[in-house]
């Protein structure tokens, strides 16, 4: 079992234990212990928190060193840094920053704040467009839920109306309930328990 775990192969099945789901992939092999995408420029401080605790907006953008970027003829990813807003900044246009300056400007919470689980500020990468998009999706979901509720209520009322007995059936049931049913002369009044 231990050797199978080290080699990454699945262990032999054990009797009495069901293997319903596949074994989770060991993410420790893919990600280093500190949050650094290993594509950042050398010399930048690595973030102190674990990768699973930070939202994607806090992770470094994939950038190459300036010499490589200049040799390739410009940035490799046309979108630029993830956490930088696309529109003009409220305090006016500013000169474009190098990837190292962008990386240093994006704040990363310290590990105790990230681990505390308390209320956190919005991530610096959350753009106004994304917030509007989230609001639109929320409004669409609410409208869909309201439509489904109205449709359910309409169907329920139709079912009630469809299964309502006719007045003739109500009268028949009333008379049959009031009339004594003919019984055998030896039959008891009531069935014993």
Swiss-Prot record:
GO terms for cellular component: mitochondrial envelope; mitochondrion. GO terms for biological process: apoptotic signaling pathway; cellular response to hypoxia; cellular response to ionizing radiation; determination of adult lifespan; DNA damage response; execution phase of apoptosis; fibroblast apoptotic process; intrinsic apoptotic signaling pathway by p53 class mediator. The modification Phosphoserine is found at residue 10. Residues 1-31, 71-131 are annotated as: Disordered. A motif (BH3) lies at residues 137-151. It is found in: Mitochondrion. Keywords: Apoptosis, Mitochondrion, Phosphoprotein. InterPro entries: Bbc3. Coiled coil: none annotated. Induction: By DNA damage, glucocorticoid treatment, growth factor deprivation and p53. By ER stress in a DDIT3/CHOP-dependent manner. Essential mediator of p53/TP53-dependent and p53/TP53-independent apoptosis. Promotes partial unfolding of BCL2L1 and dissociation of BCL2L1 from p53/TP53, releasing the bound p53/TP53 to induce apoptosis. Regulates ER stress-induced neuronal apoptosis. Belongs to the Bcl-2 family. Interacts with MCL1 and BCL2A1. Interacts with BCL2 and BCL2L1/BCL-XL. Interacts (via BH3 domain) with NOL3 (via CARD domain); this interaction prevents BBC3 association with BCL2 and results in CASP8 activation. The BH3 motif is intrinsically disordered in the absence of a binding partner but folds upon binding. Folds when bound to BCL2L1. Also folds when bound to MCL1. This is Bcl-2-binding component 3. It comes from Mus musculus (Mouse). The gene is Bbc3.
